[in-house]
């Protein structure tokens, strides 16, 4: 599923942590990621609040932040993955198995569109999740690489009024891409007191137009 996994990671962190807790980034957190994968430029030894880590996770899709948050909550990524699977089962997911907090390629890390919709539905009921996920850009606290505090920007184009694919009513969601998963996209939109969740998996550059088509159909035909 790639980085849409991070919706579940964020939900668990929000349920387990205070936003002001401090997270220390280990060598493993920072460097145990695929080369060239999404990052917020956080380095070994940096210390950030859970809040800043969540903004890095959900806006910049930072894999080092996913690792650090998982270890902060559970002591290891493996233990955190157990929490992820337990939470998914509790939400009614039946076709998923999560093996890491970031969504990077792993043959034992998989989900379904329906399961991701269930996870997203739970996440958008959390006010802090909505605040973080709906933010356009955010300035992180100072780190080694960015002593003035770096900025992270939301990758989800349907939430950005300046993008051609902006969708009126869209208020939350997450992008994802890996070579194995293709383009993945979770989007939540609200219109006339109805909220719809669209999930596109293994997209091939049409994930935004596919999501628009799903929303247009849903809002036209359901009430």
Predicted feature locations:
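Active-site-adjacent loops and short helices of periplasmic peptidoglycan-processing enzymes
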Residues: 1-114, 121-127
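Domain-terminus/edge residues, biased toward the C-terminal soluble/receptor-binding domains
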Residues: 93-94, 105-223
């Amino acid at each position: 599923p790639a980085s849409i996994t991070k919706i579940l990671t964020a939900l668990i962190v929000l349920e387990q942590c205070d936003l002001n807790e401090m997270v220390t980034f280990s060598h493993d957190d920072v460097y145990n990621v695929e080369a060239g994968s999404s990052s917020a430029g956080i380095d070994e030894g940096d210390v950030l609040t859970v809040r800043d880590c969540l903004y890095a996770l959900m806006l910049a899709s930072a894999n080092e932040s996913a690792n650090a948050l998982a270890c902060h909550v559970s002591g290891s990524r493996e233990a955190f993955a157990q929490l992820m699977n337990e939470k998914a089962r509790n939400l009614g997911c039946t076709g998923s198995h999560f093996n890491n907090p970031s969504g990077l390629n792993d043959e034992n890390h998989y989900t379904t569109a329906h399961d991701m919709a269930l996870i997203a539905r739970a996440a958008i009921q959390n006010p802090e999740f909505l605040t973080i996920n709906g933010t356009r850009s955010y300035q992180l606290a100072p780190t080694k690489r960015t002593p003035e505090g770096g900025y992270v920007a939301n990758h989800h184009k349907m939430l950005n009024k300046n993008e051609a694919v902006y969708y009126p009513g869209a208020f939350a969601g997450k992008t994802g891409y890996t070579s194995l998963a293709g383009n993945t996209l979770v989007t939540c939109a609200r219109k006339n007191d109805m909220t719809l969740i669209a999930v596109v998996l293994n997209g091939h550059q049409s994930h935004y137009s596919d999501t628009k088509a799903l929303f247009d159909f849903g809002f036209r035909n359901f009430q």
